[in-house]
């Protein structure tokens, strides 16, 4: 059975299908339409935002048999070979595993050979920031005056580690992290196409926990599909991610602001038996604190878009607590989350963070 993971199955095969990178797609497409073809592109951004996908589309656009175009045909031999990853003139190099200058020089020595059957020989150097200083120096000489038949695409998740001399010789595009809305809509589209049942709340959680990465979102979605036999529901999704249910997160936040440490510790002990990611408890509490703070500051506006669960109780909490205390708790939880991994165990860390917040609340 030829099963394809979602990230490969749904990889965009045209610039029009790229999500969340409108400006970059427009700039690259216009460059091809105007015949202004740069010799080197630098694509930077976090994981799963489309760097490799855009690089492959650039390679197809440069080498499509109908001509240089922003709309490659996908039917010619070159387009199909690039999509399958078997094109001899599109060379993908993982810089993380080829950091030595000797290896880079060996690659660069071959660039003077003409393409086997394409218009251009395209080199994609992924994670280029991993190259050594000597490797960058070797690459710099080629980037200054490359042969006419050579194009470079550099991809990185850490652009600051790339020397300025390299960056200045490339057309640099900084890819944005994807919005939760874009990720949610795409996941929804995939599930509808596949005829899967799903809970929109579960998709919203997956979209949020993907942290702007479409690949992470698709991997989480695939995990959820396997767990629930293609029926994505809220219960399985929260258990999969180790997220406390909203009721527990709300009650912990309520007890915190009421300075009721006894009830808070009893609930934490109850939660510990379920088996959750402890940092997720802090994250969900911070969400409630954010909602309470916004309701406190903008009651008329925020009330219209506020979550419906526990609405009356949340309004009461907002009325009974000062902006200072709400902000203070948020700040302590935020700092505590960063330092949680230094505690002897995460449960102990969360308990101490919440006790500190209770101690510092002013009445």
From Swiss-Prot:
Keyword Transferase carried by entry: yes
Binding site for ATP: 45-52
Subunit note: DNA polymerase III contains a core (composed of alpha, epsilon and theta chains) that associates with a tau subunit. This core dimerizes to form the POLIII' complex. PolIII' associates with the gamma complex (composed of gamma, delta, delta', psi and chi chains) and with the beta chain to form the complete DNA polymerase III complex.
Tagged with keyword NADP: no
Swiss-Prot/TrEMBL keywords: ATP-binding, DNA replication, DNA-directed DNA polymerase, Metal-binding, Nucleotide-binding, Nucleotidyltransferase, Transferase, Zinc
Binding site for Zn(2+): 64, 73, 76, 79
CDD domains: AAA, HLD_clamp_pol_III_gamma_tau
GO cellular component, one term: DNA polymerase III complex
Enzyme Commission number(s) from the entry: 2.7.7.7
Gene Ontology BP annotations: DNA-templated DNA replication
Catalysis performed (reactions): DNA(n) + a 2'-deoxyribonucleoside 5'-triphosphate = DNA(n+1) + diphosphate
Name of the protein described by the UniProt record: DNA polymerase III subunit gamma
Any one GO molecular function term: DNA-directed DNA polymerase activity
Record organism: Buchnera aphidicola subsp. Schizaphis graminum (strain Sg)
Its job: DNA polymerase III is a complex, multichain enzyme responsible for most of the replicative synthesis in bacteria. This DNA polymerase also exhibits 3' to 5' exonuclease activity.
């Amino acid at each position: 059975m030829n099963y394809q993971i979602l990230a490969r199955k749904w990889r965009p095969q045209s610039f029009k299908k790229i999500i969340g990178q409108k400006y970059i797609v427009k700039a690259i497409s216009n460059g091809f339409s105007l015949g202004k073809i740069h010799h080197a592109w630098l694509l930077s951004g976090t994981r799963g935002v489309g760097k490799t996908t855009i690089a492959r589309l650039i390679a197809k656009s440069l080498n499509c048999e109908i001509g240089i175009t922003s709309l490659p045909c996908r039917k010619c031999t070159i387009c199909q070979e690039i999509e399958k990853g078997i094109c001899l003139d599109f060379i993908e190099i993982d810089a993380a595993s080829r950091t030595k200058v000797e290896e880079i020089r060996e690659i660069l020595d071959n660039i003077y050979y003409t393409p086997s059957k394409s218009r251009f020989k395209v080199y994609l150097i992924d994670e280029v920031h991993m190259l050594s200083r000597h490797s960058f120096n070797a690459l710099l000489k080629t980037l200054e005056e490359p042969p006419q038949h050579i194009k470079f695409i550099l991809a990185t998740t850490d652009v600051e580690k790339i020397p300025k001399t390299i960056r200045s010789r490339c057309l640099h595009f900084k890819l944005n992290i994807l919005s939760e809305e874009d990720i949610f809509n795409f996941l929804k589209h995939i599930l509808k196409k596949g005829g899967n049942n799903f809970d929109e709340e579960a998709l919203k959680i997956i979209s949020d926990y993907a942290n702007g990465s479409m690949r992470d979102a698709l991997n989480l979605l695939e995990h959820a599909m396997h767990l629930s036999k293609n029926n994505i529901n809220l219960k399985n999704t929260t258990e999969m991610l180790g997220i406390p249910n909203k009721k527990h997160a709300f009650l912990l936040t309520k007890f915190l602001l009421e300075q009721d440490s006894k009830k808070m510790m009893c609930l934490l002990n109850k939660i510990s038996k379920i088996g959750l990611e402890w940092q997720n408890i802090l994250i969900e509490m911070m969400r409630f604190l954010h909602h309470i703070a916004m309701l406190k500051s903008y009651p008329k506006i925020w009330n219209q878009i506020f979550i419906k669960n526990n609405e009356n109780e949340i309004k009461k909490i907002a009325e009974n607590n000062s902006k200072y205390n709400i902000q203070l708790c948020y700040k302590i939880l935020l700092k505590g989350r960063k330092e949680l991994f230094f505690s002897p165990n995460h449960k102990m860390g969360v308990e101490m963070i919440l006790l500190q917040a209770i101690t510092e609340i002013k009445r």
